[in-house]
């Protein structure tokens, strides 16, 4: 796994270097909300809930497009910031540390192929019958996804997700067996009136997984 990841990283750096002289397009999109509400959310007396609430939030996505074969995406989140709450940077004086990075990935196509690679912080969603969200895996994480369209009806994606590693907040433990990785594959198939997606996923916990 280490060797494969190293080769992919090297290929990504080479591809980025060859595209450095080209023009880059920036596309920015997002959502900026401020809201004020007054409501009795708890009918018990002396419940301590505030009836008047105000909050702000910001969602911003920046697409950096070098070519049809190379693109980077950053997605920032600020808030919810409930007005007056110091822990969320919305009390008197503001200056809170509320900027969060949701996505930070690079999309690129392997030269001379149709295979697409996504590397970095990205969404991971396993197929589900309802289409609402998978109860198995529906979250953002860090890893690599490789996808390819083999025929008009069949495609496939292979992913590696580094879920956990070195998460002792005090850094007092030196457990070499604290890495958690997930490896999975999905094979979407579409035919006349039928769409199915066989998939599988496995997890590994241990030293560098």
Residue ranges and their predicted role:
Residues 155-209:
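Internal metal/ion-chelating core segments
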Residues 2-122, 144-158, 187-194, 198, ...:
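Beta-barrel outer-membrane channel/assembly domains of diderm bacteria
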Residues 42-44, 86-88, 131, 168-170, ...:
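Outer-membrane beta-barrel and related beta-rich outer-membrane complex signature
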